Amino acid sequence: MAQESCDLNKDEAEILKPSSSSSPSPSPTTASPSPPTAQMTEPPPPQSTPPTPPAAAAAASAAAAPQFSAKNCEGILIEVSKKRKLAEATATDANAVVVAAVAEPLSPVLFVNRCNVCRKRVGLTGFRCRCGELFCPRHRHSETHECSFDYKTAGREEIARANPVIRAAKIIKI
């Protein structure tokens, strides 16, 4: 099995296989068996260690660093993505708080458990109309709250679905 290592300099960890003089097996993530340095499109960020030749760096990392298996890299990938998602979530939450603070005085106050007509608290006895609003027992009927739902058209469609038009086949009379 070829040696695998994790490149943690990128945002997402990838499994990179170092090039060797023996016959390299094709990587499932890449189409060409070129070395990992040729696959990188952007330069890696500067590190605190002095730069070393690629062959010496591969030999030093193989001798000194523990070898990572695919499972370890997947765990690191998950941790990195969780951290990134958490950072994005906190950034969007901060933006949402600023937007909510600006928009809060302008937005109307919504009452969830109140009648839409008389603003009486309905609790568990509220009636949800077909127009989507909540009403008390006095205003639950469509005539009392000027309902926008078209009951006549809905009734016609329901009857048409329940009673399809049946036409008899033509009979040839002799």
UniProtKB/Swiss-Prot annotation:
Per UniProt, the keywords (alphabetical) are: Metal-binding, Stress response, Zinc, Zinc-finger
What does the record list as coiled-coil region(s)?
none
Comp. bias intervals (Low complexity): 18-41
Q: Which residues are listed for Zn(2+) 1 binding in this entry?
A: 115, 118, 136, 139
Q: Which InterPro entries match?
A: AN1-like_Znf, AN1_A20_ZnFinger, Znf_AN1
Keyword Zinc-finger on this protein? yes
Q: Where are the zinc fingers (AN1-type)?
A: 109-155
What would be an example GO MF term here? Answer: zinc ion binding
Q: Where is the composition biased (Pro residues)?
A: 42-54
Residues in the signal sequence: none
Q: Where is this region: Disordered?
A: 1-61
Q: What induces it?
A: By cold, dehydration and salt stress.
Q: Which is a Pfam family this sequence falls into? A: zf-AN1
Question: Which sites bind Zn(2+) 2?
Answer: 129, 131, 145, 147
BP terms from Gene Ontology: protein ubiquitination
Q: What does this protein do?
A: May be involved in environmental stress response.
Record protein name field: Zinc finger AN1 domain-containing stress-associated protein 15
Q: Which organism is it from?
A: Oryza sativa subsp. japonica
